[in-house]
Amino acid sequence: MSRSVKKPPFCAPHVLRLVNKAIAQNKLNSIINIHSRSSVILNKFIGLTFGVYNGKTYVPVKVNDNMIGRKFGEFSPTRRYTGHVGDKKVSRK
């Protein structure tokens, strides 16, 4: 089920605090490291760079206007796809 229309989009309070602090100190080019992958990207985040934790490292995510309304976790994959093993048959001549 989707979130109720009556409720505002979820964004963790500590993420909002970090963003407000970065905007107040005019540190728009610095990376803001966050663990909250479930937070929704808001309008005030446009132009900022976030380091979204994927369980091992912080993946840099530069927010643009196409990302509004989506979650941070969508841009930081947690699993690494190694691909399928190729066909190991021996070719005969």
UniProtKB/Swiss-Prot annotation:
Matches recorded under InterPro entries: Ribosomal_uS19, Ribosomal_uS19_bac-type, Ribosomal_uS19_CS, Ribosomal_uS19_SF
Keyword NAD: no
Keyword Cell cycle: no
Disulfide-linked positions: none
GO cellular component: cytoplasm; small ribosomal subunit
UniProt record similarity statement: Belongs to the universal ribosomal protein uS19 family.
Ranges annotated as spanning the membrane: none
Domain of life: Bacteria
Pfam families per the UniProt record, alphabetical: Ribosomal_S19 (PF00203)
Record keywords: Ribonucleoprotein, Ribosomal protein, RNA-binding, rRNA-binding
GO molecular function: rRNA binding; structural constituent of ribosome
Protein's UniProt name: Small ribosomal subunit protein uS19
General function of this protein: Protein S19 forms a complex with S13 that binds strongly to the 16S ribosomal RNA.
GO terms under biological process: ribosomal small subunit assembly; translation
